[in-house]
Every structure is written in structure tokens, then in C-alpha cells.
């Protein structure tokens, strides 16, 4: 297991189309920010994007910027800047990296797209379905830009999603409309709102089909592919362009399946990733698992942008239902049932949990879940200690040693 093996990673042609989509997205925001029109709304990644788009806003998602800070390995040097301002090193490193970057006047958008700064918001809209940190994050920028901040406060630890849950969230979403209309300078057109929700649903369905191709043996896609291909599902839901680019991706993946072509050469082990990616180690982790003929092919994280409950004929209630059924909002019992279904569907041999130091809401290995799931399914697991953005919290050598030992364990189980 310790012998190094050269790995040839198979790139998807349509990844280039998605890269162009993301470049166009950021350039459009930059131009609007400079001109002052169209107006720009900031939104959390699972926030009320459909309402914002229907009101004519361009929508910027700061979490994607933070992921870029992590992937470019800029974040580790920027987090201490926010820590010095009073933000604890234990809170979300998306927040601390992003605020640190703003204070220092740097952004990965400069090298990637020639863009000098993040876009100026006219309004910021959050949903705390991910965590409370997003509210603090947006409030900080609201003060800096003198822009209004509004949001939805979601229930936590939800078991069965009830009509009471849905009604409560739908009312909060409806209450956003009036203040957002004032900023937009226009009324919410319900026909346009329904059109946007329909496109968001179509994008979501295509993204699900993309991720579901990993159930094929061998899988035509990896989790690490998914973390970069998910861009349009996050920033582009509600747009035709996101739908179009995912149709191209899905066709390419289906062609791989038809040809028996796997993303990992000679795939032997199928791994489920539970938790956040380590953005600054995507390539290293992809190479590590592939060198062991292991494909990390499915995850809870990438599935977080599948919203099958969206219904253009009932936009507010269906948005409330979709965004409350989100995995991160649910109880441990609901999460465990979900993961068990995923393990069966993707024919998984082992689970890797990422215990992200600054993201407790996405670290589901702290209260006995790995042990309970292994007892129920017989599928072994490994926990990796690290973080989504702060590489000081990760030991590369320890991760490598533990992963190699885990794959050896899976090998021994096969006899």
C-alpha cells in the first residue's frame, strides 16, 4: 500500500463548459458592480435565490468565493486577519477566510478572471438552514456596504418535516418580499417567480441525475469531480444556462457508462464521503484514493443542492419544504436513514467522515453516528481530522497513513 503509483486522472470534456459558465457568471457580476446595474443581491448557498432572481437581481453567493479561497490555499493566511478582529478560530473558516480576504483587499477572482474585488451588494439575504454563522457573516458585510440584510431562520434537528415547519418557513419567505421589492424597485411578478422556480427544479433534477451516474460500476465520476462541477447548481439555479450546461455533462457521463469507462482506473473500492471537502487538498486526496484503486464517488455534500420538492405552482411552500428537508437541518435519525439509503444505492464499501474543525454542522462523526451506522450496515468507516479551509488543522501524512490503512482493511474484508 505504501508504494507510490502514478495516477492518470480522466478529465471530463464538459468540465471546460462549466468553467466557462463560472467565468461568465463572475464577470457579469463584476460588470454590474462597476456600473451599478443590474442590482446585486448576496445570497447564502441554500438561501431564497429564486425570489431574488424573480425580482431581477443578479445573485452572488459568498460561499463559492470562500471555497475558492480554500482551493487556492489563500485561506490559511487570511483566517488570522479575521481572528485578530475578534472572530474565533473555532468558527466557520469560510466566514473568517472571506472577511480576512476583504480586509486585506485580495481575492482569487483576480488570478482566475482578472476581477479585482467581490461585487458590491444592494441587499443581502440569508437562510440559517446551514448554520448561524451565515447571519453574522452577512451582517458584517451589510455594515461595511451600508446595505440592508434580511433572512430566514430555520428550524434545527428536524425529524419528519411537517406542515407546521413548512408554514413557518414559507411565511418568513413571504415576509422577505416587501423589503426586497423596495430595494429592487419593482413588484414580484408571480409568473416570473414560477418560471424561475421551474428552472431551479429542472437544474436540480439534472444535477441529481449527474450525481446518480455514480451508481454505475465503475463510476464515471468522483466526489472530487462533483465539488468543482457543482458550481452551476449553487450559483445558477433558476437560470436556463445552468440547465443547458448540465445537459452536456449528463450526456458525457452517460457516454462513459455506455463505454464502461470509470473515472478511476481499475476501480475496486467504492467510498462515500460524509462532510465537507478539504478544499486545499482536492487534487491530493483525489490522487491518493485513485492510487489505491478507490473511488470516492458519492457524498452528502454534493447532494445538498438537490431540491426535488420545488414546485412552480406552489413556489413559497415548495421552497420552504425543499430548503427544510436539507440534510444539515435534520435530526440524527433522519440523517442516518438518508445515509443508509445512499450506501445501498451507490453500492458503497466504506465511508470516510471528515471532521472539519470549524464546521460542526457538517461534521456528523462527533456523536456516535459512524458507530451506529457501522453496526446497522456492516460498512466500516474512517474519520479524517481536518478543515474545509484552514490547512493548519490538517496533517497530510496522518491522512495518507490512515487512508492507506483503511483501504487495506477493506481489502482484508474481501479475503
Which residue ranges define each predicted feature?
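Short hydrophobic segments within beta-strands
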Residues: 43-44, 272-274, 354
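Redox- and metal-dependent alpha/beta enzyme cores, enriched for Fe-S-associated oxidoreductases
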Residues: 53-83, 272-340
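Internal, well-ordered alpha/beta segment that forms a basic, Gly-enriched binding/recognition surface
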Residues: 101-213
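An N-terminal, globular interaction/scaffold subdomain
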Residues: 42-117, 137-138
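TerminUS-proximal long segments
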Residues: 336-344, 348-350, 354-415
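Short, flexible loop segments at the rims of nucleotide/cofactor-binding pockets, characterized by
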Residues: 17-20, 98-104, 326-332
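A charged, amphipathic alpha-helical module
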Residues: 2-39, 170, 174-296, 300-301
Amino acid at each position: 500500500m505504501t508504494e507510490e503509483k502514478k495516477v492518470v486522472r480522466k478529465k471530463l470534456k464538459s468540465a471546460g463548459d462549466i468553467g466557462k459558465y463560472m467565468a461568465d457568471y463572475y464577470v457579469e457580476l463584476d460588470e454590474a458592480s462597476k456600473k451599478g446595474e443590474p442590482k446585486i443581491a448576496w445570497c447564502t448557498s441554500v438561501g431564497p435565490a429564486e425570489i431574488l432572481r424573480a425580482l431581477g437581481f443578479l445573485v452572488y453567493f459568498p460561499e463559492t468565493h470562500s471555497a475558492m479561497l480554500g482551493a487556492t490555499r489563500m485561506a490559511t493566511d487570511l483566517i488570522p486577519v479575521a481572528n485578530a478582529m475578534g472572530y474565533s478560530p473555532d468558527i466557520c473558516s469560510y466566514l473568517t477566510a472571506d472577511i480576512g480576504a476583504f480586509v486585506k483587499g485580495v481575492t482569487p477572482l483576480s488570478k482566475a478572471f482578472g476581477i479585482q474585488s467581490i461585487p458590491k451588494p444592494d441587499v443581502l439575504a440569508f437562510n440559517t438552514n446551514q448554520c448561524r454563522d451565515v447571519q453574522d457573516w452577512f451582517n458584517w458585510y451589510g455594515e461595511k456596504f451600508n446595505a440592508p440584510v434580511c433572512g430566514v431562520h430555520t428550524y434545527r434537528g428536524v425529524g419528519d418535516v411537517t406542515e407546521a415547519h413548512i408554514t413557518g418557513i414559507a411565511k418568513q419567505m413571504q415576509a422577505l418580499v416587501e423589503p426586497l421589492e423596495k430595494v429592487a424597485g419593482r413588484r414580484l411578478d408571480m409568473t416570473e417567480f414560477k418560471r424561475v422556480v421551474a428552472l431551479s427544479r429542472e437544474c436540480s433534477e439534472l444535477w441529481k441525475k449527474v450525481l446518480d451516474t455514480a451508481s454505475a460500476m465503475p463510476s464515471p465520476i468522483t466526489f472530487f469531480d462533483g465539488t468543482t462541477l457543482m458550481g452551476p447548481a449553487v450559483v445558477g439555479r433558476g437560470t436556463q444556462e445552468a440547465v443547458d450546461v448540465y445537459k452536456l455533462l449528463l450526456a458525457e457521463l452517460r457516454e462513459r457508462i455506455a463505454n464502461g469507462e470509470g473515472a478511476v482506473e481499475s476501480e475496486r473500492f467504492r467510498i462515500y464521503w460524509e462532510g465537507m471537502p478539504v478544499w486545499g487538498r482536492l487534487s491530493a486526496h483525489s490522487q491518493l484514493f485513485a492510487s489505491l484503486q478507490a473511488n470516492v464517488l458519492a457524498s452528502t455534500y454534493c447532494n445538498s443542492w438537490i431540491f426535488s420538492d420545488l414546485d412552480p405552482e406552489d413556489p413559497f411552500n415548495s421552497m420552504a419544504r425543499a430548503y427544510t428537508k436539507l440534510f444539515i437541518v435534520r435530526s440524527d435519525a433522519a440523517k442516518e436513514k438518508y445515509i443508509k439509503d445512499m450506501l445501498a444505492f451507490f453500492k458503497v464499501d466504506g465511508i470516510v467522515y471528515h471532521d472539519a474543525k470549524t464546521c460542526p454542522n457538517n461534521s456528523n462523526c462527533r456523536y456516535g453516528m459512524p458507530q451506529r451506522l457501522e453496526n446497522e450496515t456492516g460498512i466500516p468507516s474512517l474519520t479524517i481530522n481536518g478543515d474545509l479551509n484552514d490547512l493548519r488543522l490538517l496533517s497530510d501524512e496522518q491522512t495518507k497513513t490512515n487512508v492507506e490503512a483503511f483501504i487495506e482493511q477493506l481489502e482484508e474484508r474481501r479475503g
